[in-house]
Amino acid sequence: MSNAKQTIETGKAVLGIEFGSPRIKAVLVNETGEPIASGAHDWENRLEDGIWTYSLDDIWTGLTDCYGRLAEDVKEKYDTVITSLAAIGFSGMMHGYMAFDKDGELLVPFRTWRNTITGEAAAALTKEFSFNIPQRWSIAHLYQAILDGEEHVGNISYFTTLAGYIHWKLTGEKVLGVGEASGMFPIDAKTRDYNQTMIDKFDALVAPKGYPWKLREILPKVLVAGEAAGTLSAEGAKLLDKSGNLSAGIPLCPPEGDAGTGMAATNSVAVRTGNVSAGTSVFAMVVLEEDLKNVHEELDMVTTPSGDTVAMVHCNNCTSDLNAWVGLFKEFAEAFGMKPDMNELFGTLYRKALEGDKDCGGLLAYNYFSGEPVTGLNEGRPLFVRRPDAHFTLANFMRSHLYASLATLKIGLDILLKEEKVKVDRIYGHGGLFKTKGVGQGILAAAMDAPVAVMETAGEGGPWGMALLASYMVHKAEGETLEQYLSGKIFGGETGTVMEPDPADVAGFETYTKQ
């Protein structure tokens, strides 16, 4: 009997499931956190009545299909079935708004993080709290509904996020992991709970409306990584596994957000570490030693799954424009009768960029495929410009587009690292930009003027990170922190391939962004 089969049959495997934007993915891991099976379900949000949403049917059909595909993978690989698990954890896209009445009925369609319909509320709360409240945060959605006089608000008994909703329906527990909760409402780093001063301010703000609830009564309870968060109910087991093989009573860990699972999957939960996820969009998260001195609209304040404060820079645009140009070069090659392999094409063009001038020789790219809040743009218009005396070469062209993919991120990071003087020992890079060895990594190191590590074992991303958080709950030693557990038992001291910033690259990127 294989070790993995034995792990599954003895109920020692741990399951992580993440509801991402394009897909729901499940990862099953063994006692040492190694993935042994997976399943996925593709889904798409829809725009209905001007709201980006997923229906409840989308959510439950997606979950059961995803779990069913995981069960098929287990059957195919190990010729066995899952009847019990050591632990389960759910994560999802953070923020958004799911409001329920006293009977557990959804009051209005799920409003996802993608909606930019809460500008008035976000601005008012940011001013009231002296704390940046982005439009996608749950509290901004609630306050906007209040400002708009929406009838359902008086009937709210509970509101939560997507991961919180799934967890509630499977366990009966109205809880959230602190990282996920930090995208609903600001967290007090000392108490690892909602900021009571801000809750009091909110209650005072809406008191004239006469609603029958106080804010804390309708928010999920906050838990930190490692705490018990309920067990799978008999009804929950049926919702998850249509085959009926899965038994009730399995412990669940606190549901987390996709930011927290990304931190776990890259082993960047410790103070002075961070990670950058760079693909279609890009975001950077840095775990802080102390609170920032000022409020910055470019920076979101969230937490690690353990409740340490994290500053996040989120940009809508990263590689889309770059990918479009690579597609054009593919057409050029095909016009000459060549059939280029896309991985080879990307690799060749990315490596070519290393031959370019450090400041891109007078070439400048703006990669705004869509609107960009960090730079105040409502719509995207990708642009490429050059000075008449520019050094117009393929190397500089590629380098300028690679710089552009991280330039907006650099604007936010400069506020963090230069204005706020935040110290970072190491950043972990993951995502498509880092596939070509040493290129995207070196450019990020230049943008941040800090060492950047890329793990060989990027693992399975978010759902793997969620499985690790569930594993931590059941496998942690007495007094063992999440940071100690991940570093010692999962990553085993692996720090990945590290690139130090090249001073000439740092200076070149500075010159480029000032243009």
Q: Model-predicted segments: where are they?
A:
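Glycine/Thr-rich phosphate-binding loops that ligate phosphate moieties of nucleotide
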Residues: 2-41, 45-47, 57, 64-65, ...
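Gly/Ser/Thr-rich active-site cleft segment
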Residues: 19-21, 32, 100, 129-256, ...
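Phosphate/pyrophosphate-binding loops at sites that engage ATP/ADP/AMP, CoA/4′-phosphopantetheine
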Residues: 63-85, 149-153, 196-215, 240-244, ...
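Conserved phosphate-binding catalytic cores of ATP/NTP-utilizing and phosphoryl-transfer enzymes
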Residues: 2-10, 76-79, 141-148, 234-245, ...
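Residue-level preference for well-ordered alpha-helical positions
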Residues: 126, 167-168, 199-203, 237-241, ...
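Gly-rich Lys/Arg/Thr-decorated short loops/hinges at beta-loop-alpha junctions or inter-strand turns
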Residues: 43-53, 124-125, 178-181, 213-219, ...
